[in-house]
Amino acid sequence: NSTSSIRAKYETLRDAEVEAGATHYTALECWNETDGAQRSYALSENVTMNILYQRFYEEKASDENDYSVCLLITQGTKNYLFTGDLEHKGEESLVKSNDLPACELFKGGHHGSPTSNTPGLLSVIQPQIVCVCCCCGSDEYTDNVENMFPSQAFVDNVAPYTDRVYVTTIVADNAAGYTSMNGNIVVTSDGVTLTVNCSGNDLI
């Protein structure tokens, strides 16, 4: 949200880093490789961060979530996809504009929202492991149980590809507050095998 306190804090910290000598690029600058920006950045000897294209980097969106920056991390033959809060129109553009590979890891879009994680995207990436950052069962945004994060539509769309879905937090009773589900989800890879370790539990 362009007017939120979180956005303001981000901009303050970003501007401070730039003033201290860091270089800031937008996703579109990276995709177009302008002013020294690159589409791909080597994070280590065998790990690369790739900026993916989606049309709302340069078009006006009706939903601010569609301005999300999308990344593909590659480690040898392993692929890890991050789409932020990208909605269905953005996902459609993402699939159309990029040669997306099958992905060993997918960070579930928009907290498992029914307006993201579309069959069109999932049928291409066919994720093996999905991690969702949300409070499962919370009615903060809706009273409709089917649409509470992670939504039933999300579960139905992911189910053909994997049952390895991890969720950070859960709530059964608002009065009792939130409790850890899987908790902090740590995915590690030796380049061959992915291992998931969670601070709460390893249930899927």
Where are these regions (language model features)?
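Non-globular, low-confidence helical/coil segments that flank catalytic cores
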Residues: 1-204
